């Protein structure tokens, strides 16, 4: 399995070979994440139980791809920002207050 760093390198090679860096501004990448997330959501439109898994995989890959590119353009360590966010979520959602609940942290 490829490491995250190897995936980043493969994605960057793909972009470089096509001279697309000029289009991959933080703003454009953020927009692309939203667009692809909407396409992912569309896979589940009107039916929560029947969906085309191959299409879900395609759209999910697009979302991850753009997220990885945005983090790279902004020089962010994906692993670290996820760990940092998990730590914040651990504080905001203590198990003893939120176990089995979907309540937002400020309403616990």
Each language-model region and where it sits:
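Flexible "arm" and connector segments at domain edges
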Residues: 1-60, 64-108
